[in-house]
Amino acid sequence: WNQGAPSIMARWNPIQGSVESLQDQWNQEGIAFKECLHDWSAPHRLFELKSPKGSPADSESFQQGKYYIQDPSTLLAVHLLDPQPTESILDACAAPGGKTAALSSLMQNQGTLHATDPDPVRLKRLQSNLHRLGIQNVRSGENLTQLGQASKAPSYDGILVDAPCSNTGVMRRRLDVRWRLSTSEIQTCCEQQSALLES
């Protein structure tokens, strides 16, 4: 159960060029690709990748920020939120930045997007990813205080909370979960999720 190697899925980043130029570059790099269609996503956004030269993440197109390796399932909440270029959005528990980047893409790199994560190591990874992807409408910090929002109650048009979870939904990519997950860890996740929603 869930023992097979998962597919490598990619989300095109329109901030760094057209999908046609990305596909041309994939062809030059020897990366085979197939479009993945979902009724909730616009065409030409999601692709399954296969590379004969190792990981697609080692490719120049990835380093240039033209795409982000990301499961389609992680994007559904982003599309349900439906952020607009004129809106103010909060992405809580944002690292490593996949959903933040997808939010920015739908906002056309405009509007106001605040991204927070309490883990400084993960926060640096988020900032590195956003820089690679050419995203400019994001302010990030460990909490709202770092974003200068402590003295006033911030008002957002939408809030995305990707709360800490058990990872049972991504066992194909996190094989260690089946061996390390415990009842107490699930209970801790529930408490953290409740605290986040109440805040």
Write out the residue ranges for each language-model feature:
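S-adenosylmethionine
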Residues: 1-199
